[in-house]
Design a protein with these regions (language model features):
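Acidic catalytic loop of the alpha/beta-hydrolase fold
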Residues: 200-204
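Short beta-strand/loop motif that positions the catalytic acidic residue
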Residues: 189, 195-197
Length: 319
């Protein structure tokens, strides 16, 4: 797995496919290859997929003594996409990754072509205590031995088999204390947005997901029936069809947002060059790809053909 230096970290990542860039952010204690295993084969046909390991996860080493803060994950993402040369991109986040995605969207909405978040609430409520209990290593040892073994394998690389024992309490300490996003914050998120949740999610009540989708300027909601927190893996057909349909429906807007940002960047570069002549730089390269910058075009034709998407599970609800 390659790495790139960003925000003081060697961020490990997976990359698949070719096309407009799509960044996928995994949940706490997980990895992109696990959370999005059912999405990678399908969406790599039309997009260049980037799946970075969050700090302390997988192969992205992290100084446990420094602590863990959710806003640092936003800084990490910003540094990662800058280092990758991704001016604009599609962004999908799950759980912890969804919070990172939302906070990045507040900070830099103009960078996003579209936004999709799964299993996320922007409200403080009692269910955060559920997450905190799950992040207790002593409880995990006693009640979840299979999960403990998996965590050891998942986060062992370069950090030691017990790395997760430092990671869980660090994440738990920041759950419920990170700043809440306000209605004003959410109104800044102007790219087309999809909010997805399961109707049996132990962490996110449906009314919270519904409220989030209503507060986003261009939001829509997917509710997965009979599903808990991990909509992408528990209802992959439903989620894949909904996400592919979302990309089809917003393709023109997404392309326009990418072009608008490119024009602004070119104008800023021209103004800088005219005010202070400098040597012409070498052609920009994408350090993640090792060759050319990620494509900035529109979605590939397969998105117009629903037969390419996995068949949806019966009974999905969108609003």
């Amino acid at each position: 797995m390659p790495t790139i230096r960003a925000n003081g970290l060697d961020i490990a990542y997976d990359v698949h496919g070719a096309g407009p860039p799509l960044v996928l952010l995994h949940g706490a204690t997980s990895l992109g290859a696990k959370d999005f295993a059912a999405q990678i084969p399908l969406f790599a046909r039309a997009f260049r997929l980037y799946l970075p390991d969050a700090r302390g996860h997988g192969r992205t080493r992290w100084d446990a003594a420094a602590g863990f803060r959710y806003d640092w994950l936003v800084d990490d993402l910003a540094a990662f996409v800058d280092a990758a040369g991704l001016e604009t991109f599609h962004l999908v986040g799950f759980s912890m990754g969804a919070l990172t995605a939302l906070q990045f969207a507040v900070r830099s909405p103009e960078r996003l072509r579209t936004l999709a978040v799964v299993g996320i609430s922007t409200q403080r409520e009692p269910r955060t205590s559920v997450a905190r209990r799950l992040m207790d290593p002593v409880r995990a040892d006693r009640e979840e031995p299979a999960w403990v073994a998996e965590l050891g394998r998942r986060h062992d690389a370069g950090q030691g088999v017990d790395a997760w024992r430092r990671l869980l309490p660090a994440i738990a300490a920041d759950i419920g204390v990170q700043p809440l996003l306000t209605p004003r914050d959410l109104r800044r998120i102007d790219p087309p947005a999809l909010v997805a949740c399961g109707d049996r999610d132990s962490f996110v009540p449906i009314d919270h997901a519904w409220g989030l989708s209503r507060q986003l300027p261009d939001g829509r909601l997917l509710v997965a029936p009979g599903c808990g927190h991990e909509v992408m893996s528990r209802k992959p057909g439903l989620f894949n069809e909904a996400l592919a349909g979302f990309f089809r429906a917003t393709a023109a807007v997404a392309a326009a947002r990418g072009e608008a940002h490119s024009r602004m960047s070119r104008a800023a570069s021209t103004q800088t060059a005219s005010s202070a002549p400098i040597a012409t730089p070498a052609a920009e390269r994408n350090p993640l790809d090792g060759d050319t910058p990620a494509p900035s075009g529109t979605d590939s034709d397969w998105l117009a053909d629903p037969d390419h998407a996995a068949a949806p599970d019966p009974g999905g609800a969108t609003r």
